[in-house]
Amino acid sequence: MNKLKSLISLVALMFVTSAWAVDATTGPNSVYVEQIGNTNTVTIEQVGGTNTVGGTGGSATVDNTGATTLTVTAPSTSNYATINGSSNTVGITQTGSSDSAQYNIKGSNNSYTSTVTGNSNQTKLSIGNSTTNGLRNTVTETITGNSNMEITNIVGSDNNVSTTMNTGSNSNQVTNTVTTSNADITHTISGSNNIVNAQQIDAAGSAGHSLTNTITGNYNSITTQQQGTNDTTINMATTGDHNTITVRTSSSAIASPATAIAR
């Protein structure tokens, strides 16, 4: 097993980076990164199958058949794939099948890009939490392949999420939960039998929540839910047959939130 570990710390004006360690035996690669500080750039590229960018524990599951799954824990010392700081740039590219990536970002003005090419890959991203908001962060996710899954959870304000499934990408799952004011979510999907869940929660702010879905394909299941005290905007354009689309908006908490079910 190849292992790659990076520990990056920025304390005041001092920048310390641990050595990259790679052992050349065959098998899955594991990357576990902990970064503390501002204005850093992390670029990770994995080619092959069953590779892992690690951290933030394991679990998730759903089904019947709102699908999901995940159950990754592996990379360590003690798990990692975290960023604490602002104005950082993270780029993850995974090419292959059955890869996984989990990241937790706390801070503002960070940029996260995930590019997944292959089948049966799983990616989970968290920005902010109940004690730390993530402000003005940008998330860009691109999927090319089948049966992939991406989960994004964001707490904070003025965050943007953009997900693209390229032509011929089928049976994928995207779940965006944004507990934030002034959130923008954009989905561009070309493929069939995909599941998309988008939920925007919290006071919408003067500009409101915004969600744009552009769907080309058949048998896709799309559920969007927005709640907040101010304006919300949903722009939905679909081309194809047998798609199921659920749109719910409310000025208060949505009772019994729905989940997209596979067609």
What is the role of each PLM region?
Residues 1-263:
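Long, low-complexity, polar and repeat-rich extracellular regions
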